[in-house]
Amino acid sequence: MELTEDGTLESYIAFLDSNPESPLRPQAEKQIYNLYTQKRTVEVYKGFIEEFQTNQYIDSAWWNWYQVELIRYDSSVFNFFLEETDIPFKEEIRLDQKLFSAKFLPFSTAGEFGFMDVTGEVTIPAKYEFANFFQEGLAIIVQNGKYGFINKRGEIQI
C-alpha cells in the first residue's frame, strides 16, 4: 500500500479509488473509518454514513452515532432513529425503547446480585458481587472484584 505510506485519510481514499478490487480493501476501509471517526462525535458519524455508504464499517458508524445520542438518555432519541433514519438496528432500538421506561430493581440471592422488574420477574440473573439501582439507563455492578456499569440488557458498558 505505497499510496498510503503517509497514513492520511485522503491517501486511503485515493488508494481505494485507484484499487477498488484490492485484497487490501478491508484494511483500507478500517483505516478510513478509524481516521474519519477519531473525534467520535455525532457529526463525524453522520458524515461517515453519508460519505462512505459501502464501507464495511458503516454499521459501526450507525451504532456509535446512536450510542453518542443515548448519552442524553431521552426517549426522543429512540423515536428519531426509528422514524427519521435508516439505521440497520431498528429491533435493538425498539428493545431499548421498551427498556427505557422499565423499572429494574436489584435483588440478592445466595450472595449474588441481579435485577428484577416491578412484578418480581428476573430480568438480569444474579451473578454480581454487588449491584446498585439503575440511573439514566445504567447500574453500577461489581463482578470479579471490578466495578463497572451495565445497561438494562445486562451488557457491560464501562
Where are these regions (language model features)?
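Residue-level detector of conserved, function-critical positions
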Residues: 1-11, 23-158
